[in-house]
Amino acid sequence: MIRNIVLDLGGVLFRLDREEALRRFAALGVPDVEKMLDPYLQSGYFLQVEDGRMTEPEFRAALSSLAGRTLTYDDIAHAYFGFLSEVDAYKFDFIEEELGDYRIFILSNTNPYVMDFCESDRFLPSGRTLSSFCEKKFASCEMGMVKPDRRFFETMLLEGEMIPEETLFLDDGPANVAMARELGIHAYQPQNGEDWRDKVRQLLRELN
């Protein structure tokens, strides 16, 4: 019996466009950004801001140093939002209309810029925020851990009071799905931007 549904952000609730993000960061003058930005796990300063080792002001200062000029919060936010080619509003309608009997959680490798956006009235046309659709968000930049670190999943299960066998996890990252399954969590790996509603309906019928 499934009681909990855990969703990733990028690739699952957002359609990702890595090339646009690379273009925007390059336009800011950040060198070698293609070596640091990855669809699933970042490296360098981009990893440090995602795993909480670096604060947003520290990250902004580091990128400014790389670019050789002062970058603003809005400069970097605009570049990061290149990743988010589309927020799939219909998926939030699905969560609201069909998943009301389940506990909804977010587990995401993300950064302060994206989290600020998710909690703003710009997130969806309705003005609703991400938090209004879920019981709790487990954001890497706030938790100090990134997927596929086993500890991140174990912390989520503990703090969310979830039983693995009662949990369904959606993530577009192969290593993340593999770790979830290793812990006994039911998992599905959608393609970037996939409409996974019918698949979730099917899985819930099979697992319930």
Where are these regions (language model features)?
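Asp-based, Mg2+/Mn2+-dependent phosphohydrolase catalytic module
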Residues: 1-3, 111-112, 117-208
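Catalytic-core regions built around general acid/base machinery
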Residues: 90-101, 133
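Short amphipathic alpha-helical segments and helix-helix/interface helices
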Residues: 92-96, 106, 153, 177
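N-terminal helical cap/lid subdomain that shapes the substrate entry/recognition surface
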Residues: 2-89, 100, 111-115, 202
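Generic structural signal for small/hydrophobic residues in well-ordered secondary structure
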Residues: 8-11, 52, 106, 137, ...
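Proline-centered loop/turn at the N-terminus of a beta-strand
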Residues: 103-105, 186
